[in-house]
From Swiss-Prot:
Transmembrane segments: none annotated. It is an enzyme of class 4 (lyase). This is Enolase. One of its GO terms (cellular component) is extracellular region. GO terms for biological process: glycolytic process. PROSITE patterns: ENOLASE (PS00164). The keyword Cytoplasm applies. It is found in: Cytoplasm; Secreted; Cell surface. CDD domains: enolase. Belongs to the enolase family. It comes from Xanthomonas campestris pv. campestris (strain ATCC 33913 / DSM 3586 / NCPPB 528 / LMG 568 / P 25). One of its GO terms (molecular function) is magnesium ion binding.
Length: 430
């Protein structure tokens, strides 16, 4: 039986040493599921509320005991004997129980932990891996996603002078996920050698990418191209580039303040700046190219390069189906980043991905800068045919755990395993 017998939460630590919530759901048949909730550094203002205690004498105010108490009290009592196999019904009960638009009463971290743990428990009850169980919910084919590997960190993810938050490599020319992972790993180690050769730091940021000081943002791109070549791959063929500009972080009074470039640019000027990069480098994806409130600028960027580059809304859409619909209706961006903790339940996450598929927008399942060993997002990416996954660099076990889970899934699928490769960019095939 898949009725809920017990729900339990606790406070654990994430990869940045901050508290986060872990939830467990036990079913009447003894089946068990566990999930840990991630946390972001650069966050959209419209994200669901991550409930923190605010007690400065404990974990500098970042404790999550209130959220834990909400799970162990109100949520556990309400969901006792509920059928966890009814994922939509369970998530609707959680949303109604919170009763706020942004999940601020009980906390999105409380709701999400239970929502994901319940799915794990039902998968265990059915003796299925999570990806297989989720694919029955989504009624979707399965595919191994292209990894967007963040090998240089800047912005809010690193203590350096690089304005842009992530510089990524995408191994699109590989025939399998395992080969793509190998390519990314070889480029990562090649990049370390190149940085050392240039006398630059090889310290890593929150997501495992290197975080050196460069003379300019464009030097990061040039250094990556050098590393790709040194590793024996061809940029523009085997490997494409991606950026997470995270421009809301340096958008101030209507201007984009690029400290590393010593420039303050209007929306029009910044669109020109990005378009010039697209013309010069094999860039296939730009995330948060404009600030989350600069919808006019987003439209300019979409009109300018949206037919040849994937334009990903993260802070812009915050995995929220209501906000995402506004973007679809206005033709803004052409892809959405999917972060489970931005919206707070599995059902709403799957709804956002389904909306993307229906509108011919690409969907990219993503980690957060504060992660754990939890690998749920790997299963979600496969089960929804999301075609791309962002889960950091090729070091730090909190990032590599997701890659290793994808290797396991690929092996389990055997001859039925399909790697998205160049077909990942669905929004560019219109």
């Amino acid at each position: 039986m898949t009725t809920i017998a017990k729900i339990l939460a606790r406070e654990i630590l994430d990869s940045r040493g901050n508290p986060t919530l872990e939830a467990e759901v036990t079913l009447a048949d003894g089946s068990f599921g566990r999930a840990a909730v991630p946390s972001g550094a650069s966050t959209g203002t419209k994200e669901a509320v991550e409930l923190r205690d605010g007690d400065k004498t404990r974990y500098l105010g970042k404790g999550v005991r209130k959220a834990v108490e909400n799970v162990n009290g109100t949520i556990a009592e309400t969901l006792k004997d509920f059928d966890a196999a009814d994922q939509q019904g369970l998530d609707r009960r959680l949303i109604d129980l919170d009763g706020t638009e942004n999940k601020g009463r009980l906390g999105a971290n409380a709701l999400l932990g239970v929502s994901l743990a319940a799915a794990h428990a039902v998968a265990a009850s059915r003796k299925q891996p999570l990806w297989q169980y989720l694919s029955t919910i989504t009624e979707s084919d399965v595919a191994l996603p292209v990894p967007m590997m963040n090998i240089i960190n800047g912005g809010a993810h690193a203590d350096n002078n690089v304005d842009f938050q992530e510089f990524m490599v995408l191994p699109v020319g590989c025939s399998s996920f395992s080969e793509a992972l190998r390519a990314g790993t070889e480029i990562f180690h090649s990049l370390k050698s190149v940085l050392k050769g240039h006398g630059l730091s090889t310290a890593v940021g929150d997501e495992g990418g290197f975080a050196p000081d460069f003379r300019s943002n464009v030097e990061a791109l040039d250094t990556i191209l050098e590393a790709i070549g040194k590793a024996g791959y061809t940029a523009g063929e085997d490997i494409l580039l991606g950026l997470d500009v995270a421009s809301s972080e340096f958008y101030d009074n209507g201007k984009y303040n690029l400290v590393g470039e010593n420039k303050r640019l209007t929306s029009e000027q910044f669109v020109d700046f990005l378009a010039d990069w697209v013309a010069q480098y094999p860039i296939i994806s730009i995330e948060d190219g404009l600030a989350e409130d600069d919808w006019a600028g987003w439209k300019l960027l979409t009109d300018r390069v949206g037919k040849k580059v994937q334009l990903v809304g993260d802070d812009l859409f915050v995995t929220n189906p209501k906000i995402f619909k506004e973007g679809i209706d206005s033709g803004t961006a052409n892809a959405i980043l999917i972060k489970v903790n931005q919206i707070g339940t599995l059902t709403e996450t799957l709804e956002a991905i389904a909306m993307a598929h229906a509108a011919n927008y690409a969907s990219i399942v993503s980690h957060r800068s504060g992660e754990t060993e939890d690998t749920t997002i790997a299963d979600i990416a496969v089960a929804t045919t999301a075609t791309q996954i962002k889960t950091g660099s090729l070091c730090r076990s909190d990032r590599v755990a997701k890659y290793n889970q994808l290797l396991r899934i690929e092996q389990a699928l055997g001859s039925g395993a399909r790697y998205a490769g160049r077909d990942a960019f669905v929004s560019l095939k219109r």
